[in-house]
């Protein structure tokens, strides 16, 4: 029996798809990329209108390319659109965000009854769904979900409605899970969650968790998928200062560079607070890569607000940014606000920020030409290998030896945007090494 999983959206979904894959394997399925499988799972996203469109398109693709499959739709889109999806009788099983581990139970039930199953828990107060992995298929960087849900209710965001309230994985389970992954050869682990920095288990907060994780023997890199600026407290700064296991990259959502818009968004900081904390981070790690998310065209965003955001992004010197045009989401306060921004104006502002993004990326990448950086190599094509540095630069090298899954020291020779091109220091000719090590 074969199964295929289509995954959309965030790193949390990537982790949860791996858990589903494990469950399928344990029950006799070969998880494959080949279509026309016996079981087909679509793990959906609904964070933006575009995510909704991609989810619908992927569901239709999955149905068409897997005509004999038991089709299962799970995740954030099915959590809020389960009634709409239930009208499509080609979808056999519909699960939400809090019961993805019920796939096997539901497959067996469907085989018996041949009746569509809709199992979506609409209560916001959930318990943390038990999930644990000891490998990550076809990857050399493993994601570990430590937390689910969000209590912030930013006025633009549907996620508190799809993921429910904050709940967290047991402290000991997180440590055991990462220890198992490291024993199985993973050198880098990425902590992920819906609101990762809100982690709390008994008396252990997020910084306590980091303190224990960095002690795990054999773990070379610990990456945080995303963290709010308000959670970067003195305890976190102390860990950043003391541990070289924490990578030189941190993703801190900004959302807007206008204090007026931040207030309308119900964000918990202003630009001054944000800037001051960034300065503290750079005092500890001068070359750290700081990336962010911004939303363009939030209701009420006028030209001055956009210019303020543009200037603030330029001033902070992000090494990269994700740019999203604002889209109305059901249940959110922003969807009901006056002064919705014209779509053409949004598109023009997005274009301007994408140009700024490219300039910022090039500026940051160029700082490392001639420098030696450690790279975890993840993919290969013949003698060409691609991986990422601690500060999340994408690097390409050529090598005759197999370096996939290994961390190698590389000298960066040039930029072929958006990739850095370098050479393994171990393969540099002797006469050149003296220059490199000066």
Residue positions per predicted region:
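Short, conserved catalytic or interaction motifs in soluble domains
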Residues: 148, 159-164, 229, 267, ...
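Short glycine-enriched, charge-decorated loop/helix-capping segments at active-site entrances
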Residues: 46-47, 163-164, 263-269, 336-341
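Terminal RNA-binding accessory module
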Residues: 336-438
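Residue-level signal for inorganic ion chemistry
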Residues: 41, 76, 103, 191, ...
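Short flexible coil/turn linkers enriched for glycine and charged/polar residues
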Residues: 137-140, 150-152, 246, 256, ...
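Conserved SAM/AdoMet-binding glycine-rich loop
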Residues: 71-72, 80-81, 85, 183-303, ...
């Amino acid at each position: 029996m074969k199964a295929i999983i289509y995954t959309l959206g965030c790193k949390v979904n990537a982790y949860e798809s791996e858990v589903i894959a494990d469950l399928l394997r344990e029950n006799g399925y070969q998880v494959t990329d080949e279509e026309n499988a016996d079981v087909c799972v679509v793990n959906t996203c609904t964070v933006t209108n575009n995510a909704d469109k991609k989810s619908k398109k992927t569901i239709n693709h999955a149905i068409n390319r897997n005509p004999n499959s038991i089709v299962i739709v799970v995740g954030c889109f099915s959590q809020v659109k389960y009634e709409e999806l239930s009208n499509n009788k080609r979808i056999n099983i519909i699960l939400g965000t809090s019961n993805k581990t019920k796939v096997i139970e539901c497959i067996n039930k469907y085989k018996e009854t041949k009746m569509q199953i809709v199992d979506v828990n609409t209560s916001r107060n959930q318990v943390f769904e038990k999930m644990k992995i000891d490998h990550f298929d076809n990857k050399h960087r493993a994601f570990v979900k430590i937390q689910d849900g969000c209590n912030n209710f930013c006025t633009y965001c549907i996620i508190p409605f799809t993921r429910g309230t904050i709940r967290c994985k047991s402290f000991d389970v997180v440590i055991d899970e990462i220890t198992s992954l490291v024993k199985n050869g993973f050198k880098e682990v990425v902590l992920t969650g819906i609101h990762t920095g809100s982690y709390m288990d008994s008396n252990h907060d997020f910084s306590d968790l980091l303190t224990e994780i960095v002690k795990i023997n054999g773990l070379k890199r610990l990456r945080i998928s995303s963290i709010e600026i308000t959670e970067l407290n003195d305890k976190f700064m102390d860990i950043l200062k003391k541990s070289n296991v924490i990578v030189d990259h941190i993703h801190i959502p900004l959302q807007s560079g206008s204090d007026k818009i931040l207030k309308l968004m119900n964000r918990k900081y202003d630009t001054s607070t944000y800037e001051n904390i960034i300065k503290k981070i750079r005092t500890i790690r001068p070359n750290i890569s700081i990336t962010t998310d911004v939303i363009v065209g939030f209701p009420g965003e006028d030209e001055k607000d956009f210019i303020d955001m543009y200037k603030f992004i330029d001033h902070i010197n992000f090494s990269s940014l994700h740019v999203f045009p604002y889209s109305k989401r059901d249940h959110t306060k922003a969807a009901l606000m006056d002064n919705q921004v014209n779509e053409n104006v949004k598109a023009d502002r997005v274009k301007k920020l994408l140009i700024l993004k490219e300039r910022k990326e090039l500026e940051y990448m160029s700082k490392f030409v001639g420098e030696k950086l450690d790279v975890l190599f993840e993919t290969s094509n013949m003698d060409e290998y691609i991986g990422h540095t601690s500060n999340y630069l994408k690097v390409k090298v050529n090598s005759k030896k197999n370096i996939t899954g290994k961390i190698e020291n590389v000298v960066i020779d040039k930029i072929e945007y958006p990739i850095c091109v370098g050479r393994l220091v171990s393969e540099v000719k002797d006469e050149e090494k003296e220059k490199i090590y000066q």
